[in-house]
Amino acid sequence: MLGAIHLGVLAACFVLFVPMAMAGWHLSRNKMLFFSGALFISLAVCVHLTPYFPSVSDIVASVSSVVVYDHRISCINEVNQIVWDVKPVPNPESVRRNNGSTKLDYFVKNWDWMKSRKVLSCEFQKLDKFDVSDLLNGSWVVVAGDSQARFVALSLLNLVLGSDSKAMDSVRGDLFRRHSDYSIVVKEIGMKLDFVWAPYEKDLDDLVVSYKKMKKYPDVVIMGTGLWHMLHVNNASDFGFRLRQLSSHVESLVPLTPKEQEGGGSVSGRSVHLFWIGMPVLINGMLNTDEKKEKMSDTVWHEYDRSLGESKILRQMGGPLILLDIQSFTWNCGPQCTLDGMHYDSAVYDAAVHVMLNALLIESHQSL
Ligand SMILES: *[C@@H]1O[C@H](CO)[C@@H](O)[C@H](O)[C@H]1NC(C)=O
Ligand SMILES: *[C@@H]1O[C@H](CO)[C@@H](O)[C@H](O)[C@H]1NC(C)=O
Ligand SMILES: *[C@@H]1O[C@H](CO)[C@@H](O)[C@H](O)[C@H]1NC(C)=O
């Protein structure tokens, strides 16, 4: 049994050094004080309960790990909480003079995370090129799905390569070849990005199975479908059935064991970080064919949305994929942000990418 003095010294060390170690993870001073206080109280409780438990160190370890991780993990539920500020450009004349401008160019679109207390406490931030290079260094990223997924891939590459870089010019051309796959290696950071044209859920399913066969898994998979199925199959219960199949394949095929990182550390949980690109709001009157207007009605959209929820593929329903809530982004950006009622301004997909990266930071237990 430890003496009272030993215990006191141990407690003092914890209160002092644990928050200092955390400060190394870029916690603000207020947070540090908060953690010091929380630890102090936890330790005081521990000391009083010690006689009832076999070992002080077990309790201390469990208390500190709970304090550290609980806070950020719950932030996954808040990461999609963003608000939009869309207003007319101050100088429409200059837009008009610029050739090839569309309606989208007449609106300035800004977005940020909601300023509620809970969301603020999560300290989400838009990542710059260097943050992303750091985070995705050496990673294999796969974006798979329909045209929405393609726009997400474009936004991610914009961020990694820089939107005015020469490289981006050729990316834009190659990525938008109709209905085809695309692959690029960003040498500077050893990141590989694959875009896989996979307009149906079955295509996504096949992709997951193929990784299993190769025994080689990407680090990040961002996928999303729905619109093709809605237009060409138009059967929400079939959509739900396909999603359940995809979900169960993801659950059974993608390994859960900790995986060694390049840096030497290991990450617990699923070794692949998985995201689902939600369906955009469809503005029926703006859809560009009669077939679309008829098949992609609000009623059908809601049936598809319900099937997505019931498929339990999303984390919020207990499934494996974290939602990038395109529905909320497109609804809040509004009709000013789309030309065809289906594909939206790049600002929407940029937001989705920043949401994904913030979730990835939390999931991989990293901070900037
Ligand atoms: C717009 O197009 C016209 C003729 O096509 C050209 O003379 C002019 O330089 C272009 N302006 C800009 C800003 O690109
Ligand atoms: C990427 O990681 C490698 C190896 O860990 C390191 O040498 C390199 O500087 C990193 N590059 C960037 C851009 O962070
Ligand atoms: C819709 O899909 C379900 C499940 O695949 C199937 O049982 C049903 O017959 C389909 N409905 C129609 C109208 O095709």
Curated annotation (Swiss-Prot):
Membrane association type: Single-pass membrane protein
| Chain positions carrying an annotated carbohydrate | N99, N137, N235
Q: Which GO terms describe its molecular function?
A: acetyltransferase activity; xylan O-acetyltransferase activity
Q: Which residues lie on this side of the membrane: Lumenal?
A: 54-368
**Tell me, what is an example of a GO biological process annotation in this record?**
xylan biosynthetic process
Name the predominant localization: Golgi
Compartmental location: Golgi apparatus membrane
Q: Where is the signal peptide?
A: none
Q: Which residues cross the membrane?
A: 33-53
What superkingdom heads the lineage?
Eukaryota
Consequence of gene loss (knockout) = Severe growth defects and collapsed xylem. Decreased xyloglucan acetylation and decreased O-acetylation of xylan.
> Which stretches face the Cytoplasmic side?
1-32
Keyword terms, alphabetized: Glycoprotein, Golgi apparatus, Membrane, Transmembrane, Transmembrane helix
GO (cellular component) term, any one: Golgi membrane
What does this protein's UniProt record list under function? Component of the plant cell wall polysaccharide acetylation pathway. Does not directly catalyze O-acetylation of xyloglucan but exhibits weak acetylesterase activity in vitro.
Protein name (Swiss-Prot/TrEMBL): Protein ALTERED XYLOGLUCAN 9
Which species expresses this protein natively? Arabidopsis thaliana
- Taxonomic lineage from the root: Eukaryota, Viridiplantae, Streptophyta, Embryophyta, Tracheophyta
